[in-house]
Each structure stands twice: as C-alpha cells, then as structure tokens.
C-alpha cells in the first residue's frame, strides 16, 4: 500500500488579487455524492459570488478526480486547484475556491496564480 495524506480537519484561506477575493474552503470527503452535496451547499452559502470553482480527489489510489472552472476561462481555475491537491499528495479531499469579482480582469495567468494560491492557503490552514 502506498503512502497518502488525508484531511483531518478542513480549513479556509483567502487571498485578494486586484480587488477580487478568492476564498478557499477545504473539506474531507469520502464519496463523490458527498463532494457534490458540499459543493451545492457552498454555492448556496456564497450565493452572491461570481464563481465557485472546485477540485476533488477521492479514493485510496485517487481513482476519482474531478474539477470545474465554473464559467471561468477553461483551465484557469479547476485544473490549477486539482494540481495543488495532487502536489500535496492528499486524497479524499475537496477544495472549493469562491471568487468575488473585484472589477479588474486578471487574465489567464493571473487567474491560475490566484486560484492556485487560494487553494494552497486553504490547505495550509487545514489539519492534514
């Protein structure tokens, strides 16, 4: 059996990039249904946000991996969040990053950095 990390207690992290707020919430999940339910709850909690992008990895061997850009340009939100999770070597994890648009377009590079940065911050503030 290979070594892996799991979330003991989820956390949050927030960064601000050109007046846009990126709020990451990290959750421990055991199934895809649980992840989808939490994503829906997060959308309701942050109903006034522009985007709720997410990524999750579920299963001992990371069998289930999903991500969503939630109407951000393709590959600028969900994939960077997923890459942060993979880089940290964590399974049974869901990271949802909520964006409140600040009025300034960040460009694709800026979005990737912001979503990655928020995800890293959220994971750093979680107990793994």
Language-model region placement:
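C-terminal regulatory domains involved in ligand/effector binding and gene-expression control
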Residues: 1-75
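Solvent-exposed alpha-helical segments within well-ordered globular domains of core cellular machineries
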Residues: 33-40, 44, 83, 113, ...
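Glycine-rich loops and low-complexity Gly/Arg-rich segments
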Residues: 49-53, 79-82, 119-122
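Short C-terminal domain-edge/linker segments immediately following a structured domain
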Residues: 55-59, 83-88, 125-128
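Ordered, amphipathic secondary-structure segments that act as subunit-interaction surfaces
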Residues: 75-104
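Glycine- and Gly-Pro-enriched alpha-helical subdomains that act as flexible
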Residues: 94-97, 104-128
